[in-house]
From Swiss-Prot:
Keywords: Calvin cycle, Carbon dioxide fixation, Chloroplast, Photorespiration, Photosynthesis, Plastid, Transit peptide. It comes from Flaveria pringlei. The keyword RNA-binding does not apply. Gene3D superfamilies: Ribulose bisphosphate carboxylase, small subunit. PANTHER family: RIBULOSE BISPHOSPHATE CARBOXYLASE SMALL CHAIN 1, CHLOROPLASTIC (PTHR31262), RIBULOSE BISPHOSPHATE CARBOXYLASE SMALL SUBUNIT 1A, CHLOROPLASTIC-RELATED (PTHR31262:SF10). CDD domains: RuBisCO_small. RuBisCO catalyzes two reactions: the carboxylation of D-ribulose 1,5-bisphosphate, the primary event in carbon dioxide fixation, as well as the oxidative fragmentation of the pentose substrate. Both reactions occur simultaneously and in competition at the same active site. Although the small subunit is not catalytic it is essential for maximal activity. The basic functional RuBisCO is composed of a large chain homodimer in a 'head-to-tail' conformation. In form I RuBisCO this homodimer is arranged in a barrel-like tetramer with the small subunits forming a tetrameric 'cap' on each end of the 'barrel'. Disulfide bonds: none annotated. Belongs to the RuBisCO small chain family. SMART domains: RuBisCO_small. This is Ribulose bisphosphate carboxylase small subunit, chloroplastic 4. InterPro entries: RuBisCO_ssu, RuBisCO_ssu_dom, RuBisCO_ssu_N, RuBisCO_ssu_sf.
């Protein structure tokens, strides 16, 4: 018996470009909008701080820990702390006091993974002051905490109970020598 095999040839044709297709990205626009010549390096036109560099100081890198918001400033007075608490209350944040007896700064002891630090969570002084409307109430609690723990770091935080986030935190008191 004879075997007959048949081969079918298929022809593929390229389809013409569709009229509604978006043109491919061809690069940036021409350089016509940019200046053709480079400016000379004329340093007399650079911005200046008016020679105030001589009176600026560098934060000493040793022996001075940086804590939180406002930590680069000198210790705040009672009046300045009260103004910060007023700001916190104006923003409808709930004031809360926290204190730490041993480590007033973040450190690494229990884990070496990136982003994890010990010392971020301090002991809360009483309960958050929900309904507080006067900075004098917060300052009274601060004085009580200082009286109970004179060698503690004490910070005031502002908590937004709607978004459930801490919005502000600053050191209100540090132990002697810090």
């Amino acid at each position: 018996m004879a075997s007959i095999s048949s081969t079918v040839a298929t022809v593929s044709r390229a389809a013409p470009a569709q009229a509604n297709m978006v043109a491919p990205f061809t690069g940036l626009k021409s350089n016509a909008a940019f200046p053709a010549t480079k400016k000379a390096n004329d340093f007399s036109t650079l911005p200046s701080n008016g020679g105030r560099v001589q009176c600026m100081k560098v934060w000493p890198p040793l022996g001075k820990k940086k804590y939180e918001t406002l930590s680069y400033l000198p210790n705040l007075t009672e009046a300045q702390l009260a103004k910060e608490v007023d700001y916190l209350l104006r923003n409808k944040w709930v004031p809360c006091l926290e204190f730490e007896l041993e480590h007033g700064f973040v450190y690494r002891e229990n884990a070496r993974s990136p982003g994890y630090y010990d010392g971020r969570y301090w002991t809360m002084w009483k309960l958050p002051m929900f309904g507080c409307t006067d900075s004098a109430q917060v300052m009274k609690e601060l004085q009580e905490c200082k009286k109970e723990y004179p060698q503690a770091w004490i910070r005031i935080i502002g908590f937004d109970n709607v978004r459930q986030v801490q919005c502000i935190s600053f050191i209100a008191s540090k132990p002697d020598g810090f």
